[in-house]
Amino acid sequence: MQSLSQLGPSEIFLVARREKPSTRAQLWFTGRLSFRQETNGIRLKNRVEFSPRPVPPNLIAAEKEEAKAVLTLFFKKQGLSNSLSSRLINKSDLFIDHLVSRLHSVHKARYLVGRELTTLEIRDSLIPYLEQLHEEHGDLLAELVVSFPDPPAEPRLVASSPVSVLPPRGDTDSAADTRKLRAVSRVSELDTEGALRPQTLYLLDLGLNLEQIKTITRKFAAFPYYSLDGKIKPVVEFLLDLGIPKSDIPTILCKRPQICGISLTDNLKPTMAFLETLGIDKNQWAKIISRFPAILTYSRQKLTSTVEFLSQTGLTEEQIGRILTRCPNIMSYSVEDKLRPTMEYFRSLNVDVAVLLHRCPQTFGLSIESNLKPVTEFFLEKGFGLDEIGIMISRYGALYTFSLKENVMPKWDYFQTMDYPKSELVKFPQFFGYSLQERIKPRYELVQRSGVRLLLNQVLSLSGIEFEKVVKKKMMKLVSNNVIAEQSSGGLL
């Protein structure tokens, strides 16, 4: 006799129950299955041991949504498109039930004492299992998931009809819409006394409106099933204790509702402590979380890989800490797909990547093809050399964050009318960061009327008062020089 946790993935598919579990009344179970070998094959005999503790239906629903999210993420990592992943998930109800049952089996002790699993714990439990299945079944995994608990079709069938396991698009879209509508309708459901659910009332009190809660649910269907006292309220109170204003809570939940599925003691607080060891200023947590709450939902492996990359560029620990504090969303960038290619591109322009990262880390979130290359090509067309462009980027990394059409080009056109050589832009690329209508034009026109000459950075970088002082001083000097010149010419006569 073997327990479910001792069986390999292939054996689990053989011993899986063929009937769909009830979603109305479910109990905690150990999931132990026994079987014996007979002459005509494997005969199964289920022995399910129940605990008297019932599984709340809303918890089952939430765990199913979490399992779907993990499976979708896994499919995407295997190279499947968003639409194909969604179609597979919509046809995999029995496999999703199996994943939830596996969670109950692996974490039996947690469930017996009534402790819910966090989002990260669910992910950490299911990803290795899915990787093991993929290692065994390879390209058949998609069909295996859809056909569960039946074994997948023979490889030749998949080769001849690669999408035969998928339902018609209309059916999958309808199923997805139905589940989404069910979750959204839960937000505004009334009890027998005509009151909204406690979760909804609590969120309304925080400042969200019903439409915002429904929007969150459309993005993350597990959210309305989260326990108020077990998940939502403890996280919100913790955020408030950090100094985050109550008015910022709705924005945080809209940005990252998954944060409510994270255990404070097992995940959230340890993640914060770990980030502090990487240099994040612990006194800035309120600002960091308000700006980018997703940073608390990333695995330690992802956080570490990003920091290791930053270190490889030549940044010091102190500089890395400042970057993470000022621009925490850099943690969302993939090292291999985003950060490293961007680093290589800037190095091809002879840019000091460490300096650029420290000054303007958000530049590394831009698309090379859509944002970086067009700006580089624009300046090359205008006669700047690669070395000059590299100097401009190093001095003003934000240059590449501006819209080429709406910002850079109009300002370049106006610069052509100004009495400055191109070299002034190499010295002072910050020119592109000032407002054309409110700063550049008014100040340059004043300089022209005054008849004085200033460096480009003097025209734009000085405060209003200092700018006026410099212009007046230059004018007085100009008048004084003219008087002296007139006197000198008169003496000669």
Curated annotation (Swiss-Prot):
What gene name is given for the protein in this entry? MTERF5
**Entry similarity comment:** Belongs to the mTERF family.
**Function noted in UniProt:** Transcription termination factor required for processing and steady-state levels of plastid transcripts. Involved also in chloroplast transcriptional pausing, a general feature of chloroplast genes. Specifically and positively regulates the transcription of chloroplast psbEFLJ encoding for photosystem II (PSII) core subunits psbE, psbF, psbL and psbJ; causes the plastid-encoded RNA polymerase (PEP) complex to pause at psbEFLJ by binding to the +30 to +51 region of double-stranded DNA, and recruits additional pTAC6 to the transcriptionally paused region of psbEFLJ.
- Entry-linked Pfam families: mTERF
Organism encoding this protein: Arabidopsis thaliana
The record's GO molecular-function terms, alphabetically, read: sequence-specific double-stranded DNA binding
Q: What is this protein called?
A: Transcription termination factor MTERF5, chloroplastic
Q: Where in the cell is it found?
A: Plastid, Chloroplast
The transit peptide spans 1-43
Let me know which tissues express this protein, per UniProt: Expressed in roots, rosette leaves, cauline leaves, stems, flower buds and open flowers.
Quote the cellular component terms of the Gene Ontology held in the record.
chloroplast
The UniProt keywords, alphabetically, are: Chloroplast, DNA-binding, Plastid, Transcription, Transcription regulation, Transcription termination, Transit peptide
How it assembles, according to the record, is: Interacts with pTAC6.
* Effect of gene knockout: Pale-green phenotype, reduced growth and altered structure of chloroplasts. Defect in photosystem II (PSII) function with strongly reduced levels of core subunits, including psbE, psbF, psbL and psbJ cotranscribed from psbEFLJ. Enhanced osmotic stress tolerance and altered sugar responses during seedling establishment.
